[in-house]
Structure formats: structure tokens, C-alpha cells
Amino acid sequence: MAEPTQPLLTDSNSSSPRSLDDTIESYIGSFGWAQFLQAALVSFSGVFDAQQTFISVFTDSEPTWHCTDSNSICHESISNICILPKTAWSWDYSPHVSVISEWGLQCAGSFVKGLPESSFFVGCLIGGLVLSTLADSSLGRKNMLFLSCLVMAISTMLTVFSPNIWVYAVLRFVNGFGRATIGTCALVLSTELVGKKWRGRVGIMSFFGFMLGFLSLPLMAYMNRGSSWRILYAWTSIPTIIYCVLVRFFVCESPRWLFVRGRREEAISILKRVASIPSTDVSSGGAISMSFSSLPFEEDEEKPSTNVNIFTTMKVLVEKRWALKRLSAVMAIAFGIGLVYYGMPLALSNLDFNIYLSAAFNALMDLPANLITLFLVDKLSRRNALIGFTALGGVSSVLIFALHNMRIGNHGALQLALELISYFSACSAFNMEMIYTIELFPTCVRNSAIAMARQALVLGGVFSPIMVAAGRKNAFWSFGLFGLAIGLLGLFAVGLPETRGSDLCDTMDEEECKDRRSKVAVNNVIA
């Protein structure tokens, strides 16, 4: 799997200095089994991330019911059980199958019913803002991933013992707070362990993990049908705790981050562990130390590395005009994607499909989205692919609204097909956007930039339930706005530079110089 690479010492007299990216790849190779196993283990966190993101679709749903007295006013045409006496109807299953039936919330307001899910997404937003910079500053990628998974696992287990809706909502908030940085850390850590040729493909691995987690939920929920919703939380918490142990003892920290933070000896030790090419220089470590000590940026970064404020990276992103422009664009695009990504599964109830099958179909859409992104990531420009996916998702969503207004017979199958296309487009656009964001920002702020993009995605998830509720009366407020948002906001990619095949930069100055060189090259071509 590894590609032969010449040792760095053979180029020691070269006039053109190597970047940290080239130097690391010269020693460990582009891709090897050690790097693959590391990336696979890190990417598996997406399984537990997805389970906690979508678990409320089943645990917080309103169960089906039936009339118990055929001679009373109760009959099948009545959709609101709150107008019926309690003796006239009964749940089809035990009241413990859902939080709605167990705590008697069937007649509560929409705010109370949606409080746990809203609390989860609010926790994701706050957790992303508070924790995102820690992976770039003090904790690093590995420790942040471990702590995030641990908080999520413990809060999931404690949720099993929730006595009421209020405690349940608080624990869901804590769960979202811990979960907020898992996807970001997994994506950055897995891609920083491999060479640039394989970076796009490895980035897709974390998305496959998320797909498996989403796909496992309908199966687990179906097996748990008729049983307590607490069992579903227990089933998802125990494997997460085991995974935390594996991360703590078997995952390596990013050598790129360690070098940028001035922790050279730790970085060299990790390089020797994950090296995919046989080399006496790698095994000894001496030549590596000499080569990395010659990198000019490391000397600048090493001094302040112990006094970095956790919000320094956010300040740097805002102060640099080019960085702020890029960050604003990727966040706007992510918000549009988030509306569709989280909104479409929630809106399935508006299409009146079986909850287990519809969720499974949506989870399966992640597979073609990941496969297509995997094969196109090295063939199409990041910018054009992102615009294309968002446009396709927008058109499909608007067509659902159009079909709804036509009121033709048997249009449910067409609506479902368009819904799946729209969700598939959102998944593909999300995959491409994350890879694009990795390449748009240097190492010193990369984790924070991706975290902000994911925050915008989650913000779309906060608004989507409100739009879905409004769409039950008028489909424009759900499917219509979903389509317009993702389609129009996707056009922000027009102003971003193309990054396919380019080297990853490590400092803001290095990225700025590369941007200036590309602009000069474009001007020369035009002239």
C-alpha cells in the first residue's frame, strides 16, 4: 500500500525548501497499513456519533394507539387523542416504548415534546464553540476525540435512568455538548496521518462510519420495538465506552500538530510507529530530528506553544481577510446543507412512510454518496462538485413541493424518490465540503475552521424541525425553503479557490503566500 519515497537526506542540498507536509511524507510514506489501521479506528467514532444524532427519531416518537371502547366516540378517523377520555383509547405497545407515552406527554405542547432534541442540538452548538479550538491549541486531536467520546458515552448511559423529561433534556444537552467535536477531530486526525494523495479517500472513511451508525439505528430500534426506549440508549452506550478505551491506548496523536506545537520528540516517536516505508533513518530518529529542526516555521511556533490561548485560532481566522472570506463562505454553504441533511429525515413523517423503512432508506443514501465522493474526489474540482451537489439537492427538494401542490394520485413514490435524491445530494455536498475545508485552511487553524463549518451545519439542524412543523400545513415552508436554501447558498463556493492536488499548508503566512502565487499565475495566464 505504501509508495516508495526517497529519503529526505538525498535532497538536503536542494535549493527549494521542503514543507512540513513533504518532510513527513518523505519518512512515513503516502499510505501504509499502520496508517490505514489508525485512520479506520479513528473514523469508527462516526458510528457512535450518528447513533446519538438520530436516536431521538425512535425514542422520542409518538407511539400508535387504538380505541378500547367501540361504542364510545372513539374511532379511527380521530387523529387527536387529547379530545378523548383516557378510558376510550390505549397505546398499541407498552407505554415505556417512548418518552412521550411513558411520561404522558401526548397532549403537551410542541416545545415540551421537542425539548430533548432541541437541547441536543443546542449542546452541539455550544460544545462546538467551547471545545473546537482545544484540538488546535492545548489538548490536540487525540485527547479531544477521547474526551468527546467519553462525555457522550457517560451521558448516554445516564440517560437510561432519566426520571422525567427535564432531566432527560439536560442529559441530551450534555450528550450533544460532548458529541460536538467528534466528527471534526476524527476527520482531521485521520487525514493528517496520511500523504496528500490518499487524504481525500481517507477523509471518506469517517463518513462511512457515520453511515454505518445511522444504518444501525433502524435495525436496533426494530429489534427493540415494544420494549423500553431506555434499552436503546443502553445498547448504544456500552460499545461507546469500549471504543473510548481503544482510542486512549491505540490511537496516535497527529505528528503534524505535535511539530507545530513544538513537541518534536513525541512527533518523531509517532512517525516511527506509523512509518509505511522501511528506512534506517526512520528507525533511528536522528536524521528525522535534524531535518525537522531545519524547518523555519517550527522555531517560530515552538516558543509560544505552551502559552496559546484556546481562542487564539478563532482570532486569527477573523483577523485575516482572506481567511474570514473563506470561513464565511464555507459556513453559509454548510448551513444550507444542514437544513436538508437534518430536515429531510425529520420531514419523512410528512410523506407518511414507515418510520423504520424510511430511516433505513435515508441511511443507505450515505453509501452511494460516500462511494461517489470517493471516486470523484481526485477527478473533479472541489468547487464545481460542491456547486453541483447543492444545485441537485435544491432542485429535487423544490420538486417535492411542486408535486405536493399538484395533488396527483400516487405521487408518494415520486416524492420519496426525490427526497432520497435530495438527501443523497446533501450527504455528498457535506462530504465534499469537509474535504474542501481541510484544504482551504492551514494546520494551525484547520480544526477550528472545520468545527465552525460543522457548527453552521448543526445550526441548520436547529431550524429544520421548526420548518418541518410549519411544512405540515404548507410544504413550501419545509421542502420549498430547503431547496432554495441549499441551492442558493451553494453558490458561495464560486468565490473560493480550487484546492484539488495542492499541498496542505501549516501556517497562515504559508497559506497566504500560496494564495498570492496562485493569483499571480492566473493573472499571467489571462495576460
UniProtKB/Swiss-Prot annotation:
Q: Which family does it belong to?
A: Belongs to the major facilitator (TC 2.A.1) superfamily. Organic cation transporter (TC 2.A.1.19) family.
Question: Which residues are listed as membrane-spanning?
Answer: 28-48, 120-140, 150-170, 177-195, 202-222, 231-251, 327-347, 357-377, 386-406, 416-436, 449-469, 476-496
Localization terms from the record? Vacuole membrane
> Which protein is depicted?
Organic cation/carnitine transporter 2
Q: Matching Gene3D superfamilies, A to Z?
A: MFS general substrate transporter like domains
Q: Cytoplasm as a keyword? A: no
Give the matching SUPFAM superfamilies.
MFS general substrate transporter
Q: Which residues bind ATP?
A: S190, T191, E192, L193, V194, G195, K196, K197
> Cytoplasmic topology: which positions?
1-27, 141-149, 196-201, 252-326, 378-385, 437-448, 497-527
So which tissues is this one expressed in? Weakly expressed in roots, including tips and initiation site of lateral roots, siliques and flowers, especially in pollen and stigma.
Which CDD domains does UniProt cross-reference here? Answer: MFS_OCT_plant
Entry GO terms, CC: plant-type vacuole membrane
Q: How does it sit in the membrane?
A: Multi-pass membrane protein
Protein function: High affinity carnitine transporter involved in the active cellular uptake of carnitine. Also transports organic cations.
Molecular function terms in GO for this entry?
A: ATP binding; transmembrane transporter activity
What the entry lists under PANTHER family is as follows: SOLUTE CARRIER FAMILY 22 MEMBER (PTHR24064)
Q: Which UniProt keywords apply?
A: ATP-binding, Ion transport, Membrane, Nucleotide-binding, Transmembrane, Transmembrane helix, Transport, Vacuole
Query: What processes in GO biological process is this protein linked to?
Result: monoatomic ion transport
| Record topological domains on the Extracellular side | 49-119, 171-176, 223-230, 348-356, 407-415, 470-475
